[in-house]
Amino acid sequence: ESDIDQSIDLNIVGTCNLVKACNKKKIKIIFFSTSYVYPGRKGNYKENDPVLPWNNYGWSKLGAESAVQMYKNSLIIRACMTEKPFIHKEAFTNVKCNFIFHDEFIKILLKVINFKGVINIGGKSQTIYQFAKKYKKNVKKKKSKGELPSKIYMSLEKVNNLLKMY
């Protein structure tokens, strides 16, 4: 977040180079983006909603997404993943998101990997505290004072419809 040069080099320039290489070899690219590309003011964001990142990480991911979108043989996954176990001592009670652990994310990814376009993948829409409390009983409540937008959760309608095909 604070090292802008590194964010640009890794997320934007690196992804642009990867897209060019995939284009030369006609290889599909699967790009992992983030729910942080959405503004976080209204929640329930669909894949075709306007994007407006609220931090440098989101901006760097959106920059990378732009290159990937130019290459039609691609899948962009906008995800809201977190570590397992939940490692933080505190969790926000006033920030709603779609946290999903990596292992659950992979199960979904394997089912949608052949699709193209943009897909949101995440877990149930709930506060970070509600999510954390299920896995870490002693997690403390905390109010966000603007560290995160309050409504960064995504619509999972598209991915759920795709999963019904399996």
What are these regions, as identified by a protein language model?
Residues E1-L10, A21-N23:
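NAD(P)H-binding glycine-rich loop region in Rossmannoid oxidoreductase-like domains
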